[in-house]
Amino acid sequence: MKKIAYIEIDTHAEIAQAFMDIMRDTKDFTVDYYFSKKIKDQISKNDEAVFLSDSSMILDQLKDKGYDLIIIGTVHRFFNTFLAITKKYNTAVIAHNLNFSKASKLDLVKSVFKKDVIYRLKLWLKEGLFYSSKVYQTSGTLLVLDKAMSSEKYQFLPLFYTKDYRAAENQDRVVVIPGGVSQKRRDYRYIFKTIQHSETNKPCEFVFLGKAKDSELKELEKLSQKLPENIRITYFSERVSAEDFEKWMQKADVLWCPIQEHTEFFSLKETYGVTKMTGNLGDAVAYGKWAVFPSGYPSKLDFIIPEKENILNQLNELTHLHFDFQKYYNKIEIQKKTEQILFRLISK
């Protein structure tokens, strides 16, 4: 059996969970997981080998283990540590922000003083910020989780599969907008305005499935007072628990994902679907849901539907249509593809 180490000591617990889920029951690989406490506390595990780690421990932990491949889930900090790993081992790095991954030193210096200055100075002075692009360059492979972002330089790693559960049977239509409620990521002003001026007679519940705060929370509180009787909204002022997320995603008839075309990471512009993946893509696959995206979003996937002018009619129509997610995204099929890619990375 081939031995893999998966490291996540920074941010993306949901990606670590997806990797753990798809590798569960594999016959050809054993995987050791190295997580920070923050990540470990968010992970649901069975009998996987999970080790508590951080940037000061990880190099010693990897020593003499004989791993065939090391996968680093996020390289957004601890650059000096990760550079040492990529120099010493056969490493694959998951790239989440492609423009950040190739940023020049000058780009990074400019970015340090634009926002979060104290934190970014810490990355510069203590964590090797200027090695960031070198970590990606030195890594044996760069991985992306959205096929549309793959190229000769970036290898697509399929992780998301559709879970087995019964289709939603709601008396009233349930539209879920998954993700943290932030105008930077999705156009919530447009959503609020559309819901407020909706002219549908059909009962409908809109669920904002992510933590709302600041101005967005105030807008939701105001909106909840102005709705017609047939429209309801559900929102959360605290972090959404895994149980609540699961419950509402299963209950959803359709996902509404009006993501912004552009966002920023480390004050560098990233474009959704081109240099940055949206987590809503994985949500749609995992729960087997139609997802309505902005008309300009670059996707060839059949279950990603470009938004039409009358979005509320469109959402209603989609609740009556079927897409066979299990045919294309069942766990056996996705696991097989993932294993083939891992074998290729090991034999490079």
PLM features: what roles do these ranges have?
Residues 5, 167-199, 205-209:
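Conserved donor-binding/catalytic core segment of Leloir-type glycosyltransferases
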Residues 5-6, 59-79, 92-93:
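Short N-terminal targeting/anchoring amphipathic segment
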Residues 99-102, 106-141:
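Membrane-proximal helix-turn-helix segments that form the acceptor-binding/catalytic region
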Residues 126-167, 177:
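Donor nucleotide-sugar binding/catalytic pocket of nucleotide-sugar-dependent glycosyltransferases
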Residues 205-219, 238:
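Glycosyltransferase donor-sugar binding loop
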Residues 219-254:
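Nucleotide-activated donor-binding/catalytic signature segment of Leloir-type glycosyltransferases, i.e.
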Residues 257-282, 286, 294-302:
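Nucleotide-sugar-dependent
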Residues 306-348:
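A charged, aromatic-enriched C-terminal amphipathic alpha-helix characteristic of glycosyltransferases
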